[in-house]
Swiss-Prot record:
Function: Template-independent DNA polymerase which catalyzes the random addition of deoxynucleoside 5'-triphosphate to the 3'-end of a DNA initiator. One of the in vivo functions of this enzyme is the addition of nucleotides at the junction (N region) of rearranged Ig heavy chain and T-cell receptor gene segments during the maturation of B- and T-cells.
Catalyzed reactions: DNA(n) + a 2'-deoxyribonucleoside 5'-triphosphate = DNA(n+1) + diphosphate
Short motif (Nuclear localization signal): ranges: 11-17
Cofactor requirements of the protein: Mg(2+)
UniProt remark on cofactor binding: Can also utilize other divalent cations, such as Mn(2+) and Co(2+) (in vitro).
Keyword hit for Cytoplasm: no
Enzyme class per UniProt: transferase
Name recorded for this polypeptide: DNA nucleotidylexotransferase
Keywords: Magnesium, Metal-binding, Nucleotidyltransferase, Nucleus, Phosphoprotein, Terminal addition, Transferase
MF annotations from Gene Ontology: DNA binding; DNA nucleotidylexotransferase activity; DNA-directed DNA polymerase activity; metal ion binding
Organism whose genome encodes this protein: Eulemur macaco
Oligomeric form and interacting partners: Interacts with PRP19 and DNTTIP1. Forms a ternary complex with DNTTIP2 and core histone. Released from this complex by PCNA. Interacts with TRERF1.
Length: 511
């Protein structure tokens, strides 16, 4: 049986309802003084009412706990106009003719825009003039808010760093990571795809109706979304975060050079802390792992954009000392606009160099840094690239270009706006992880596209090429299976054009 299905097989336990005591209002937070809202609990439930009330107040709306003469807008869910008017009569409340009786879709749209929207049309359950009349209008169903056509492929969606659905995507990424630790790729991809599509949405999901028409949301994913909407968190995510195996794998894999196999081995041996692993004399470590432990504190801390820019200057100075015409491009998350990362990636290519000069460049750069005392660790992997070899069928395949995985010493004085607080214990430098990739000039567009990411964007780009265009794409090239030829490209824009896709800027590839 599918492990994901078993995880959601039983009915979810409902949490205790929150009382109205938690629904206090602070006048100084009210941005829209002319509007006074009352959210009807009937057919909605107290938990959801509390959630919407708190959300509206955070957005600057005044929401009353009890109905009063000051209320200007009454919001209801799954109620017709006559239902609301009947409720008002039962409560012996005489509604003003100016009272707006609105479907919850109005409030949701207000939350998305961050300000009040037009009340007329689809949101209105009762016309203003009917509010004081007898409740005889027929039921008026409000259709779900239309979700524009969203592609299942990340390469057809524009995903910036402005994520409106962190509460859901963070949960999905934790679950995906847990399945990756268990080497269950299928389940991991399910949650990664769901996280990817929610990151592209220009609005926050507030109700399950908002998920209608959105691709990549399987039933097990929607179950998590529903629980977070109702309870504010996922019990399954909470269980994962408290799971000893997950905590151990998360800790072990934070060490440079430690993968799943080593983590599994250490966990089975009973290790739960890095200090115990470091001090155990029976364990042997690879050269990469020894470097990972030695510089652990620096490597586990995030690399800032200022530090990345300083490393960029360092790399360009070294490369240009040997190949003055070389192009050095920062790739990865920093090219996509991120402010922090775990390492800094660079793509190097030279239009005027010979094959021998390309092969020797990284060796010369390493020797230069070693002489300057900047090279703390180096693992150079020689190129196995073959020009006539077809692109890989695997969506996660690594490329065959020459590359170097490094740890460099970055002096604080080279960093613009360097915080003095980081210079603790008299230490004047920080160890930074750096990846250098050397590629042939004619393949630079494909390599740049692949190394820019994100991981899910690249996966979907390759899936799209295979399933929709009968092509094969990887970091080396693009093969047309119908014409049986390699398609040339001088830029990323040309690759998108070959695939029949609108060009997407790096800052919109944060899938």
């Amino acid at each position: 049986m599918d492990p994901l299905q078993t995880a959601h097989a039983g009915p979810r336990k409902k949490r205790p309802r929150q009382t109205g005591a938690s629904m206090a209002s602070t006048p100084q937070d009210v941005r829209f003084q002319d509007l006074v809202l009352f959210i009807l609990e009937k057919k909605m439930g107290s938990t959801r009412r509390t959630f919407l009330t708190e959300l509206a107040r955070r957005k600057g709306f005044r929401v009353e706990n009890e109905f009063s003469d000051s209320v200007t807008h009454i919001v209801a869910e799954n109620n017709s106009g006559s239902d609301v008017l009947e409720w008002l009569q039962v409560q012996k409340i005489k509604a003003s003719s100016q009272l707006e009786v609105l479907d919850v879709s109005w409030l949701i749209e207000c939350m998305r825009t961050g300000k009040p929207v037009e009340t007329t049309g689809k949101h209105q359950l009762v016309a203003r003039s009917d509010c004081s009349a007898s409740p005889n209008p027929g039921p008026q169903k409000t259709p779900p808010l239309a979700v524009q056509k969203i592609s299942q492929y990340a390469c057809q969606r524009r995903t910036t760093l402005n994520n409106c659905n962190h509460v859901f995507t963070d949960a999905f990424e934790i679950l995906a990571e847990n399945y990756e630790f268990k080497e269950n790729e299928g389940c991991a991809v399910t949650f990664l795809r769901a996280a990817s599509v929610l990151k592209s949405l220009p609005f926050t999901i507030i109700t399950m109706r908002d998920t209608e028409g959105i691709p990549c949301l399987e039933d097990k994913v929607k179950c998590i979304i529903e629980e977070i909407i109702e309870d504010g968190e996922s019990s399954e995510v909470k269980a994962v975060l408290n799971d000893e195996r997950y905590q151990s794998f998360k800790l072990f894999t934070s060490v440079f050079g430690v993968g799943l196999k080593t983590s599994e081995k250490w966990f089975r041996m009973g290790f739960r802390t890095l200090s115990k692993i470091r001090s155990d004399k029976s364990l042997t470590f690879t050269r990469m792992q020894r470097a990972g432990f030695h510089y652990y504190e620096d490597l586990v801390s995030c690399v800032t954009r200022a530090e990345a820019e300083a490393v960029s200057v360092l790399v360009k100075e070294a490369v240009w000392a040997f190949l003055p015409d070389a192009f050095v491009t920062m790739t990865g998350g920093f090219r996509r606009g991120k402010k922090i990362g775990h390492d800094v990636d660079f793509l190097i290519t030279s239009p005027g160099s010979t094959e021998e000069e390309e092969e020797q460049l990284l060796h010369k750069v390493m020797n230069l840094w070693e002489k300057k005392g900047l090279l703390l660790y180096c693992d150079l992997v020689e190129s196995t690239f073959e020009k006539l070899k077809l692109p890989s069928r695997k969506v996660d395949a690594l490329d065959h270009f020459q590359k170097c995985f490094l740890i460099l010493k970055l002096h604080h004085q080279r960093v613009v706006d360097s915080q003095k607080s980081s210079q603790q214990d008299g230490k004047t430098w920080k160890a930074i992880r750096v990846d250098l990739v050397m590629c042939p000039y004619e393949r630079r567009a494909f390599a740049l596209l692949g190394w820019t990411g994100s991981r899910q964007f690249e996966r979907d780009l390759r899936r799209y090429a295979t399933h929709e265009r009968r092509m094969m794409l990887d970091n080396h090239g693009l093969w047309d299976k119908t014409k049986r030829i390699f398609l040339k490209a001088e830029s990323e824009e040309e690759i998108f054009a070959h695939l029949g896709l609108d060009y997407i800027e790096p800052s919109e590839r944060n899938a």
